[in-house]
Amino acid sequence: MGVLSEFKAFAVKGNVVDMAVGIIIGAAFGKIVSSFVGDVVMPPIGLLIGGVNFGDLAVTLKAAAGDTPAVVLAYGKFIQSIIDFVIIAFAIFMGVKVINRLKREEAVAPTLPPVPTKEEELLGEIRDLLKAQNNKP
C-alpha cells in the first residue's frame, strides 16, 4: 500500500498537474502554429517567389520503379517545420519574458511595515509609562 499512496501523493501534487496541463496546451498550440505557417504564412511567401508551394518542394533521389516508391528528400516540409519552430520558440520566449517581468515587479514592490494592533499600541504606551516612572527621582 505504501507505493500506491506515494504515487497518489506524487500525481496529485500541483507541479505534476500543472505540467500535464502545459503539455496539453503546448500540443494544441503546436497544431495552431503549424496551421498558421502552412495555411497563412507560406502561401504568400510562395506567391512572392513565383507561385511555389513549399509543401511540394522536394528532390527525387531515386525514381519509383514498379511497386517500389520513389526516394524523395522533402526539403519544403523541412522549411515549414523550421518556420514552425521559430514561431513557437519566439512565442515561448515572449511568454517567459512577461512572466519574468511580473516576478521582478513583485520582488521590487516594497513591503510596508505592519500596522500595530490595538494590543501592541497599548503595550507600547504601558512601556513608555513604566520608563517615565523609573526615570523620576
UniProtKB/Swiss-Prot annotation:
<feature type="transmembrane region" description="Helical">
    <location>
        <begin position="79"/>
        <end position="99"/>
    </location>
</feature>
<dbReference type="InterPro" id="IPR037673">
    <property type="entry name" value="MSC/AndL"/>
</dbReference>
<comment type="function">
    <text>Channel that opens in response to stretch forces in the membrane lipid bilayer. May participate in the regulation of osmotic pressure changes within the cell.</text>
</comment>
<dbReference type="GO" id="GO:0008381">
    <property type="term" value="F:mechanosensitive monoatomic ion channel activity"/>
</dbReference>
<protein>
    <recommendedName>
        <fullName>Large-conductance mechanosensitive channel</fullName>
    </recommendedName>
</protein>
<keyword id="KW-0997">Cell inner membrane</keyword>
<feature type="transmembrane region" description="Helical">
    <location>
        <begin position="54"/>
        <end position="74"/>
    </location>
</feature>
<keyword id="KW-0406">Ion transport</keyword>
<comment type="subunit">
    <text>Homopentamer.</text>
</comment>
<comment type="similarity">
    <text>Belongs to the MscL family.</text>
</comment>
<dbReference type="GO" id="GO:0005886">
    <property type="term" value="C:plasma membrane"/>
</dbReference>
<dbReference type="InterPro" id="IPR036019">
    <property type="entry name" value="MscL_channel"/>
</dbReference>
<keyword id="KW-1003">Cell membrane</keyword>
<keyword id="KW-0472">Membrane</keyword>
<feature type="transmembrane region" description="Helical">
    <location>
        <begin position="9"/>
        <end position="29"/>
    </location>
</feature>
<keyword id="KW-1133">Transmembrane helix</keyword>
<keyword id="KW-0813">Transport</keyword>
<dbReference type="InterPro" id="IPR019823">
    <property type="entry name" value="Mechanosensitive_channel_CS"/>
</dbReference>
<dbReference type="Pfam" id="PF01741">
    <property type="entry name" value="MscL"/>
</dbReference>
<keyword id="KW-0407">Ion channel</keyword>
<feature type="transmembrane region" description="Helical">
    <location>
        <begin position="32"/>
        <end position="52"/>
    </location>
</feature>
<dbReference type="InterPro" id="IPR001185">
    <property type="entry name" value="MS_channel"/>
</dbReference>
<keyword id="KW-0812">Transmembrane</keyword>
